[in-house]
Amino acid sequence: AGKLPTVTFYKPQGNLNEHSGYADVAKGDEHIADVLRHLEKSPQWDHMLVVVTYDENGGWWDHAAPPKADRFGPGSRIPAMIISPFAKKGVVDHTLYDTTSIIRFITHRWSLPTLPGVAMRDEAMAKAGGARIGDLTDALVLQ
C-alpha cells in the first residue's frame, strides 16, 4: 500500500471494461467500486485524484450534439467521474472536458509545457467558436 507512482493509469481487463456487447456492465461497476475502496484505504488517498472515464460512449444515444471543432473532435460525450478528497461535493460540473483534460490537469499541476496536440485542439476549438476545454480544476477545490 502507498506505492503508486505520482501518475497512474489503470485499464480493467476486457470482461470488466463495461463495453456493451461483450462485457458485463454491472460486473465492471462492481470492479471499479472495489478498486476505489482499496484506493480510499491507501495512505496516499488524502493526496489522490481518481478520474473514471471511458474511451467512447458505447453507442448509447445522447441528446447533446458534439461540440464543433475540426474533424478530429472532440466527439460525442463520454461519462466521467472525479473521485477525490479534492472533488467539489454534490456538484455536477458543466465545464466542457474531453480526454485531453486529464493531460491538461497533469500539465497544470506540474507546470509543464502544453503538448503540441493539445495546443492544436485548442486552436481548432477556437476557430470553430467552441468553448475552452477544461483541465479538471473547475471540478476541484485546490488550495
Regions found by a protein language model. Give the residues of each.
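N-terminal pro-sequences and low-complexity stem/linker regions of secreted or lumenal proteins
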Residues: 1-143
